[in-house]
Amino acid sequence: MLFVALLSTRPGNTFQEGVARRLQWDYPEGANVLAEYWLETEAPRVVAVVEAQSMEPFGQIRMDWGDMFEIEVFPVVTAEQGMEMARQAMTSGQG
C-alpha cells in the first residue's frame, strides 16, 4: 500500500533540532520510503511518500517523532492509478 505522511512542526521546536535528529534516524523496518521532501513551511514541514504493508511502521514513526511533529498519515493512489479507477468506474456505469 502507498501512504503519504505529513509532519507539521509542533511549537517550540526548531528546524535545526529536527535536522540533527534526522541525521541520526532511519525509517523503521517495513517502511519503503519512495520520497521525502522538506518544505519551507511549518505545516507541513515534511512530506514522506512511503510503501508499507500496514500502518505498523507509522506507529514507530509517531513514537520517534511525535514530540517534535504532529503526524498525519493517509493512504493514497498515484494519479495514474486514480485515472484508471475513474475510467473503470465510468465504463461500468455506462452499462
Positions of predicted regions on the chain:
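Conserved, structured core segments of small domains
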Residues: 1-95
